[in-house]
Amino acid sequence: MSLLNDRADRAGHTAIAGSATGGTAEAVQDLDRLILLGIAADLRRRTRLGDGGPHVPGAVAQDLAAAPRHQWIVEHWLAALHEHGMVSRHDAGGYHGLHAPRRAELAAARARMESARAALGYPAELADLMLRSLRELPALLRDEVGVQALLYPDGEPATAEAVYRGNLISRYLNAAAAEVLRDLAERTGRPLRILELGAGIGATTADLLPALDGHPVEFYLFTDLSPFFLDTARRRFEGGFLRYALLDIARDLPHQPGGLDLVVAATMAHNAPHVGRLLDQVAALLAPGGRVVLIETVREHPQSLTSMPFALSTAAGPPERYDARASTTRTYLRREEWLAALEDSGLRVDVDLPRQGDPLTALSQRLFVATADH
């Protein structure tokens, strides 16, 4: 990999210096197990899976009175439980033999959650989110409570900050991304033109903007699908070069071919119906030597099963996917699929972090940086 990869990696590890990473994999497993046990306990209590079987996912969803648009989530959960050995799947697609968590088992998992979230650098808000999402499963499935109410209680972003910024892997990735931007600013001989897609609460923006200090910037266009996030960002960030716009990546991107120095997409490019098509559009927007910075999850961990799927549900059900995820309920592309998609779009991959063997890889979140050579 490139010298830029080394520079970004050093910056990322400097940002988390003093944090122990040796127990990362075990901590991730503890959080995953808590959610899996919680889902299993709920399904045992409220569905026919507590009896013989096999039972098809649709029947289980009916037992749960799941709203039509959320019924796919039940099948998604059952697939995850099967993957982790907590339920058996019949050849015809039905499920049976669901694990029955004991009270002591649930208590032990909850006790381990506190040390696990601390080991991963998550503030207490993450534990609150996980436990509340388990308590609210019936209402979430019935569409009586929206996941946004869990992520932004009372309209405040503290919980979302815990998920997207205030933790070990986010600090590493954001610092590495900021170093990539700093390097670009040093190399570019004119004011920078930057587009951030799906910027959300600005968790990555907040770490990128300081990297621009002392460098000329023509504009930093902060975009999102939601006016709520744009209004929040206007109040939070200062800078005469900051601009704001509503943008839906499921539709065409702004028509500025070859005019951008940097496109940032942090934990959101997977929301595109076809990632390859999105990257083709991004590549067309970049000036020669321009870069795309992606922060992406490359494997769905069970700890997100009680939140992320609800955020993805559309009015018609599961999100439409036309890339490698078509005909599946996969949320994310794998690392190899991201690398291939970037290269297929004519971009040269310069950064792929964390390095293989780094304990941080257990969190399955990565930074990809690719350059337009055209």
PLM features per residue range, with description:
Residues 193-195, 199-252:
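Class I SAM-dependent methyltransferase SAM/SAH-binding core
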Residues 276-291:
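A short glycine-rich, Lys/Arg-flanked "PGG" loop and its adjoining helix->strand segment in the class I
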Residues 340, 348-369:
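Conserved Class I S-adenosyl-L-methionine
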Residues 260-276:
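A short SAM/SAH-binding and catalytic strip from SAM-dependent methyltransferases
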Residues 1-165, 174, 178-192, 216, ...:
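N-terminal accessory segments
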Residues 295-353:
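C-terminal alpha-helical "lid/dimerization" subdomain adjacent to the S-adenosyl-L-methionine
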